[in-house]
Amino acid sequence: MPSQVWRTEPEYIRGEAEATAFDDDVAQNYPFTHDREYTEEEMWENLEYWIKIITPIAEEEGIKLGIHPCDPPVPVLGGIPQLFRSFDAYKRLIEIYPSDSNAIEFWKGTFSEMNDDIYEMIQYFVERKKILYVDFRNVSGIVTKFKEEFVNSWFLDMYKTFSFE
């Protein structure tokens, strides 16, 4: 998530509450957020370099670092590849430098938009003690066009997400 959390115009949900929303058709027309377009390989190389430098320092200081998912988890926004948009990307992250200090932030709404089984992802990261922070957010729609919803909207079974050890 090198630049921001991306949203387009808000939409209305239950009770006429205004909610944040995203439409990839609109967002793809936004200008570059940085000086140029970057490649996914460049972004991974830079991230790996940073993780290998910062994680040992975090270990020495007793700090745990958690990477936020790309929100929304689409391939490119503003000319920047969005690395953390899949289960495989997060697996790759924690393998760069295996350490208790190298972990993730688990945003349920964002992970539910990825093309992977969210419950399998939760189980995987819980077993490895890699989840530092959980955000309870529910969304309706698909990754390229969604809106945030109330947590109790049941697009995602929030109760089931607590059932992992």
Language-model segments: which ranges?
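Active-site acidic/histidine proton-transfer and metal-coordination neighborhood
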Residues: M1-A103
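Hydrophobic faces of well-ordered beta-strands that scaffold small-molecule active sites
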Residues: L65-I67, N102-K108, L132-F136
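Hydrophobic transmembrane alpha-helix bundles
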Residues: Q28-E37, D100-S112, V139-E149
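Glycan-recognition surfaces
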Residues: G15-A17, W107, K130
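Gly/Pro-rich active-site loop or hairpin
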Residues: W44, V76-K91, T110-E165
